[in-house]
């Protein structure tokens, strides 16, 4: 790590991650190089190696940042005092993930590459953040569905988080994939990230619908 203030180090890391995120909006993971990322920063390409050893580490840091933003949304959701029905909860959860398309894309398409080519310390930092995301979802469930047992919350998490790995490819197929489905005569439903998440969460929480209060 280069000498300098912690603030400068963090600012440069953020600039590198920002450049990576911008490129990922229009280019594929395998097509992006550290040279491409460096061309979008205010310092030399070789300086990037002071902060990240591989491009996969940069992408892993981007994925970690996306999870941190999601956690912030989940924590805000849990703090609200208004009760939520399963329908309301499902819609709120779907909204938080609709804003995290980059997160869903990275973890569904490039996770093994990122983790395999990153140093253990970087991977551990990401896994800690991933664990915090699971805890944040659990807190939301405990807040709005107090009747759920610890086992039921755990079962929701172990169904929900694996489900998230398939959301992006299903919601955002490539043009080539669409054409192949059409040529194969397979009907492809058009569903958004929000729609997919909402339907899944609602189905999982239907059993915990509170009965209407007696008059």
Regions found by a protein language model. Name each.
Residues 15, 23, 30-57, 61:
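Helix-turn-helix
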Residues 135-147, 163-215:
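C-terminal peripheral helix-coil segments that are non-catalytic and often amphipathic
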Residues 111-142:
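A contiguous binding-surface segment within folded domains or other stable secondary-structure elements
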Residues 64-70:
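Short, basic, alpha-helical segments at the C-terminal edge of helix-turn-helix-like DNA-binding modules
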Residues 1-27, 35-36, 40, 81:
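Basic, helix-initiating cap at the start of DNA-binding domains
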Residues 90-115, 170-172:
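Helical hydrophobic small-molecule/effector-binding pocket
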Residues 61, 75-103, 156-160:
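Hydrophobic alpha-helical connector segments
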Residues 145, 149-157:
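Membrane-interface starts of transmembrane alpha-helices
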């Amino acid at each position: 790590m280069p000498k300098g203030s912690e603030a400068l180090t963090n600012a440069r890391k953020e600039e590198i991650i920002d450049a990576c995120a911008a490129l990922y909006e229009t280019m594929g993971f395998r097509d992006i190089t550290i040279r491409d990322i460096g061309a979008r920063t205010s310092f030399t390409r070789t300086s990037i190696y002071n902060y990240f050893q591989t491009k996969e580490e940069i992408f892993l840091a981007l994925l970690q940042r996306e999870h941190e933003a999601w956690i912030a949304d989940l924590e805000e959701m849990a703090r609200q005092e208004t009760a939520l029905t399963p329908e309301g909860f499902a819609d709120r959860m779907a909204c938080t993930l609709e804003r995290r398309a980059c997160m869903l894309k990275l973890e569904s398409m490039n996770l093994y590459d990122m983790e395999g080519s990153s140093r253990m310390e970087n991977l551990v930092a990401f896994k800690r953040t991933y664990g915090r995301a699971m805890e944040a979802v659990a807190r939301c469930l405990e807040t709005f569905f107090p009747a759920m047992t610890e086992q039921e919350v755990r079962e929701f998490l172990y169904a929900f988080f694996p489900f998230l790995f398939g959301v992006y490819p299903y919601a955002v197929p490539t043009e080539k994939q669409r054409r192949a489905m059409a040529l194969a005569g397979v009907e492809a439903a058009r569903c958004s990230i929000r729609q997919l998440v909402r339907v899944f969460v609602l189905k999982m929480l239907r059993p915990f619908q509170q009965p209407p209060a007696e008059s």
